[in-house]
Amino acid sequence: MLHTPLFELCREAGGRMVPFAGWEMAVQFEGLMAEHRAVRQRCGVFDISHMGVLTLTGSGVKDKLQGLVPSDLQRIGPGEAQYTVLLNEAGGIRDDLIVYDRSDTEVVVVINAACADSDTAWIKQQLEPQGVSVSDRKAGGVLLALQGPEAVGRLERLCGESLAGVPRFGHRDLTIKGEPVFAARTGYTGEDGFELLLTASAGQSLWRQLLEDGVAPCGLGARDSLRLEAAMHLYGNDMDANTSPLECGLGWLVHLEMPIEFVGREALERQTAEGVSRKLVGLQLQGRAIARHDYPVLHNGEPVGVVTSGTFSPTLEHPVALASVRADLAKLGNELMVEIRGRQEPAVVVKRPFYRRQG
């Protein structure tokens, strides 16, 4: 089992450690509900050092990476980032990732821990013959997610400069206690905040400082409930290698107007012309039962889809779920049933996200 540089500090902070994608990670500290509310109301910090961080370097690196993703990377420049997906030839999703444009010759990508090895091998296979160098920038480093309404203010006090000019999906190099920090205004919670890449020792020091200052340490459990309230996708649940962006609510990432070939383009063009047979929807459960991954979704007693993710929403105080259902049943307001432990529970198709922060 792999350990991040913050493993012992997470245990010291009361973290309950569990296996996750080959790593031993904290699933919770004080408790999921308390951590969830801390991020929604104040500020929380997550150890996400298990995620893959690759640095791609070489002449025209962004143009070469363009052939692997369906999103137009020419829309971003240095200091900006794009959320996108890697596709296979059938248009299925290999992984979702964020592409950070550092310069004309350098791009940083952050990928999921469970897909990191396969993503890295495939990206190398595709890009190294084109003269792109692919390296694991993380290499024992720390990746922290500082999230919540107070996150930006706390980071400003630590680095001694205003971050008001950094837009959502923008990034900047900072210095904290003399140590370089790559800071991106991104996150997986539906709140404002930054994700911070730094060395192991600097990351350990920053973790201690944040906890001493009253920031709540948060685990994978709260990370999942927060992202689900914000209707953010989880790879392996809400999308996978057999699901295209058009089928899982990520069609906005697909820019077919680009006169550029990319892996999976032909399949997506065909789906666009013919339409899709299934769509991802948000469900609000009418009772208190919680729908979980792979629970059947029914209409008039017939199976019409499956739940991809589900939880009890601490903010909304009722169960919510994402589900892949027959396309003709994806209309807002449609009433469906979810089979939960042998009982059919009523649910209604609602607008995503379930929660949207104010301001």
Swiss-Prot record:
<dbReference type="GO" id="GO:0005960">
    <property type="term" value="C:glycine cleavage complex"/>
</dbReference>
<dbReference type="InterPro" id="IPR022903">
    <property type="entry name" value="GCS_T_bac"/>
</dbReference>
<dbReference type="GO" id="GO:0019464">
    <property type="term" value="P:glycine decarboxylation via glycine cleavage system"/>
</dbReference>
<dbReference type="GO" id="GO:0008483">
    <property type="term" value="F:transaminase activity"/>
</dbReference>
<dbReference type="GO" id="GO:0005829">
    <property type="term" value="C:cytosol"/>
</dbReference>
<dbReference type="Pfam" id="PF08669">
    <property type="entry name" value="GCV_T_C"/>
</dbReference>
<protein>
    <recommendedName>
        <fullName>Aminomethyltransferase</fullName>
        <ecNumber>2.1.2.10</ecNumber>
    </recommendedName>
</protein>
<dbReference type="Pfam" id="PF01571">
    <property type="entry name" value="GCV_T"/>
</dbReference>
<dbReference type="InterPro" id="IPR029043">
    <property type="entry name" value="GcvT/YgfZ_C"/>
</dbReference>
<comment type="similarity">
    <text>Belongs to the GcvT family.</text>
</comment>
<keyword id="KW-0032">Aminotransferase</keyword>
<dbReference type="InterPro" id="IPR027266">
    <property type="entry name" value="TrmE/GcvT_dom1"/>
</dbReference>
<comment type="subunit">
    <text>The glycine cleavage system is composed of four proteins: P, T, L and H.</text>
</comment>
<keyword id="KW-0808">Transferase</keyword>
<dbReference type="GO" id="GO:0004047">
    <property type="term" value="F:aminomethyltransferase activity"/>
</dbReference>
<dbReference type="InterPro" id="IPR006223">
    <property type="entry name" value="GCS_T"/>
</dbReference>
<comment type="function">
    <text>The glycine cleavage system catalyzes the degradation of glycine.</text>
</comment>
<dbReference type="InterPro" id="IPR006222">
    <property type="entry name" value="GCV_T_N"/>
</dbReference>
<dbReference type="InterPro" id="IPR013977">
    <property type="entry name" value="GCST_C"/>
</dbReference>
<dbReference type="InterPro" id="IPR028896">
    <property type="entry name" value="GcvT/YgfZ/DmdA"/>
</dbReference>
